[in-house]
UniProtKB/Swiss-Prot annotation:
The lineage of its organism: Eukaryota, Metazoa, Chordata, Craniata, Vertebrata. The keyword Cytoplasm does not apply. This is C-C chemokine receptor type 6. The gene is CCR6. Belongs to the G-protein coupled receptor 1 family. Changing C168S: No effect on calcium flux and chemotaxis in response to CCL20 stimulation. No effect on cell surface expression. Residues 1-47, 105-119, 181-211, 280-303 are extracellular. Keywords: Cell membrane, Disulfide bond, G-protein coupled receptor, Glycoprotein, Membrane, Receptor, Transducer, Transmembrane, Transmembrane helix. Gene3D superfamilies: Rhodopsin 7-helix transmembrane proteins. Disulfide bonds join C118-C197. It comes from Homo sapiens (Human). Glycans are attached at N7, N23. GO terms for cellular component: cell surface; external side of plasma membrane; plasma membrane; sperm flagellum; sperm midpiece; sperm plasma membrane; sperm principal piece. Its main location: membrane. Changing C309S: No effect on calcium flux and chemotaxis in response to CCL20 stimulation. No effect on cell surface expression.
Length: 374
């Protein structure tokens, strides 16, 4: 073999050029190392990602802030599911606030911020993903108790509702623990003449095995185990709804199912690409063309994964009737405050009190249902 041999301890990233081994003749086992340039992938990422991240940041921040404001104005109407959805909105807000940094990094082709910022932003993404999956698991279990275990629902949920804040704190804590490897291994370092913010495992023995181990643990606890819980819960939920033929129950669960499906549709493609990338680590016979394809796919699916941050508020607005009503009330109240007084003569305060009174009356009709999913 001519040329330099590949170091199997290196953990390749799809944005870096590397050497591939190709046969020099059909009958010869000799091969030579050729440089696989991923400049096309980097150029595509430099143009596509900043625009996509900017749009996701604007719409995600606006939508999730409105969700938090809506919950804040109508906090008496919360159920356990509402508390989980509120925490998911907070996680999404924290996440989209990091996107401008990544947009700048892709646009400039280098990580221009500090090493501490690199670790922090990478960690926030991992925590957001794991927290979202665990909260969706909690939502699924809450809906399972409310619908499948209807006879026990009131007793169980009435005991658990006051503890919803503790449950959310546990979820956040587990998310931090699951994502701890992200804070440890991600760092700013120089490669091919520019600084990057990527995982670096060269400080440990057998870095490829370490990367596979960390990736496996994150996927296991942050994706596959929650997914199994959701499949179990929603299988019995759908079975119960089909048997009940209750349109009101169908409306109550519709928004939750939509949120789960959208989240999985956004996250599964990118995680499958990461699995393929991990499976290719250390292989000598990696095709340059296939690596370019993986690079393009990773860029697009990553944007798709981030897109869920601004899709959840849209789902609430178009599917959740009570959320839509509450949101419209807030808009009317804000408009009323701006105008101070309507031509009819009654004040904004009176109108707001009327809205609150109506909201409280509506909530009393169904204390056990999620106010944002009916």
């Amino acid at each position: 073999m001519s040329g330099e041999s590949m170091n199997f301890s290196d953990v390749f990233d799809s944005s870096e050029d590397y050497f591939v081994s190709v046969n020099t003749s059909y009958y010869s086992v000799d091969s030579e190392m050729l440089l696989c340039s991923l400049q096309e992938v980097r150029q595509f990422s430099r143009l596509f990602v900043p625009i996509a991240y900017s749009l996701i940041c604007v719409f995600g921040l606006l939508g999730n802030i409105l969700v938090v404001i809506t919950f804040a104005f109508y906090k008496k109407a919360r159920s356990m599911t509402d508390v989980y959805l509120l925490n998911m909105a907070i996680a999404d807000i924290l996440f989209v606030l990091t996107l401008p940094f990544w947009a700048v990094s892709h646009a400039t082709g280098a990580w221009v911020f500090s090493n501490a910022t690199c670790k922090l932003l990478k960690g926030i993404y991992a925590i957001n993903f794991n927290c979202g999956m665990l909260l969706l698991t909690c939502i699924s279990m809450d809906r399972y108790i409310a619908i499948v275990q209807a006879t026990k629902s009131f007793r169980l949920r009435s005991r658990t509702l006051p503890r919803s804040k503790i449950i959310c704190l546990v979820v956040w804590g587990l998310s931090v623990i699951i994502s701890s490897s992200t804070f440890v291994f991600n760092q700013k370092y120089n490669t091919q003449g520019s600084d990057v913010c990527e995982p670096k495992y060269q400080t440990v023995s057998e870095p490829i095995r370490w990367k596979l181990l960390m990736l496996g643990l994150e996927l296991l606890f942050g994706f596959f185990i929650p997914l199994m819980f959701m499949i179990f819960c929603y299988t019995f939920i759908v079975k119960t709804l089909v048997q009940a033929q209750n349109s009101k129950r169908h409306k109550a669960i519709r928004v939750i199912i939509a949120v789960v499906l959208v989240f999985l549709a956004c996250q599964i493609p990118h995680n499958m690409v990461l699995l393929v990338t991990a499976a290719n680590l250390g292989k000598m016979n990696r095709s340059c063309q296939s690596e370019k394809l993986i690079g393009y796919t990773k860029t697009v699916t990553e944007v798709l994964a981030f897109l869920h941050c601004c899709l959840n508020p849209v789902l609430y607005a178009f599917i959740g009737q009570k959320f839509r009503n509450y949101f419209l009330k807030i808009l009317k109240d804000l408009w009323c405050v701006r105008r101070k007084y309507k031509s009819s003569g009654f004040s904004c305060a009176g109108r707001y009190s009327e809205n609150i009174s109506r909201q409280t009356s509506e909530t009393a009709d169904n204390d056990n249902a999620s106010s944002f999913t009916m």
